[in-house]
Amino acid sequence: MRSSPLAAHVYLSVARRFDGGLARLGGLSLVAGIAACEALRGLGFGDVGLKWPNDLVVADGDGLRKLGGLLVEGGGEAAGAARAVIGLGINVRMPAEAAGGIDQPWIDLAAMSPQPVSRNAVVAMLLSRLLPALQQFDAEGLAPFLPRYAALDALAGRALRVHEGDGAWPASALGIAADGALRVRDGEGRERQVHAGDVSVRA
């Protein structure tokens, strides 16, 4: 099992109660991704974008390099409050010995900055954007975040392959729906929606 390198990256977990119940948690990973991306842009990393549903990426020609990712775990009662833990990881300084074990294109903040990157500064900015975003999301849902996502969408207009079960089909990305699903146009020109739980999307 490959372990994460010591003192090289940012790993952050935030636990929060959501009064809207379990239904409110739909779209939470998108909101956390928006906040994280906006935080990094606020630190001068203007090329960071979002790859649906939960990756922080940087465009590299026709492809994308992964900078970080998010994971959300939640639970609670359908009619009561819910709790969720948001986990976030960002590559800051990838050690050479760790880089050899990565099987996908990646990038770290050190490669994007001429100056040393402070992990403390990254965490402080992340929390300054994430905590207010979670409060707004609990009160208002996903709707006010949709335009912010569109401004950060790294898949917009890209040709994709949607992998579903044992098969895959070509599509082009159209943005996200009101519930956070990925909107795509398939090879026959039909608009379809892809939900995070049953497919993966590869640009």
Which residues make up each language-model segment?
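Catalytic beta-strand/loop module used to bind and position nucleotide/cofactor moieties
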Residues: R2-H9, S13-A203
